[in-house]
Amino acid sequence: MNKVPKKPLPSLLAVIGYPFTIAFSIFSFFQIGFNLEDFKRNFANRRLVTDTLFNPKWDWAIENASQALIETIQIAILASILGCFIALPLSFYASRATNQTTTTYFIYKSFLNFIRTIPDLFWAMLFTVAVGLGPFAGVLALVMFSMAIMGKLLSETIDSIDLGPLEAAKASGAKHNQAVFSSALPQILPNFTAYFLYIFELCIRASVILGLVGAGGVGRIIETQRIFLRFDRISPIIIFILVIVIGIEQFSVWLRRKIL
């Protein structure tokens, strides 16, 4: 007679982990000042926002925010191009597959890790002090932002390339840089293109936030109108940004299908 196998006992991690996670989540709600009564009371004030937010002033937005939206796109394009192409050679030095020297590998890897830990908003505040308010500060901030993300994504991609062509190029007498250029670079170019489009999309969103600290773009208009509770002027700007981001995302998906 076949015996029904016993159901295995839950692991120690499950016995301890799940209750701990639930208890810690409840504790965190109280720590951040969450209060259900305050939430209900403040939620009743939502009409201060929603009544105007869903009544967009299209004419005002087209007349006053069009140039700032174009500036936002220009900031994102320039920063993405500069940041990603600066990160391209750095990524090869930050990968074990193409850089066998421990010292230089550690230096470049640490540099990319360092700039990635600094928020883009801090870069924006730093550069607005260094070069003044305006889109140039935003471009510099997003260059650092783009370089950090591309450096991480691309260096990890290089780590997983096929080393066969690289070793064959070296065996045929090519120098290290020549071997990398002829054998490793072609393998990661499709990924580089896909990452570039992804970072460009991120820069569009980030440039809106950077405008809040005076780094150019449409963010400064959004912040000004928010102060005066003119959400009817903010909502069409948000819709414009949404359309731009969706368009970039769809183009990115189409292009990735073509090249990957």
Language model: regions and residue ranges:
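Membrane-cytosol interface at the C-terminal ends of specific transmembrane alpha-helices
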Residues: L133-A184, P190-I199, Q250
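C-terminal transmembrane helix and the adjacent membrane-cytosol boundary/short C-terminal tail
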Residues: A14, S235-L260
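N-terminal, non-cleaved signal-anchor transmembrane helix
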Residues: M1-I81, L88-P89, Y93, T103
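Cytoplasmic-entry segments and transmembrane alpha-helices of multi-pass inner-membrane transporters
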Residues: L90-A124, L153-E156
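Generic hydrophobic transmembrane alpha-helix motif, especially the helices
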Residues: L112-S146
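Glycine-rich helix-loop "coupling/hinge" segments at transmembrane-helix boundaries
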Residues: V129, R205-I241, L260
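Hydrophobic positions within alpha-helical transmembrane segments of bacterial inner-membrane proteins
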Residues: S80-L88, F92, R96, L121, ...
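Alpha-helical membrane-protein architecture signal
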Residues: W58, I62, S66, I70, ...
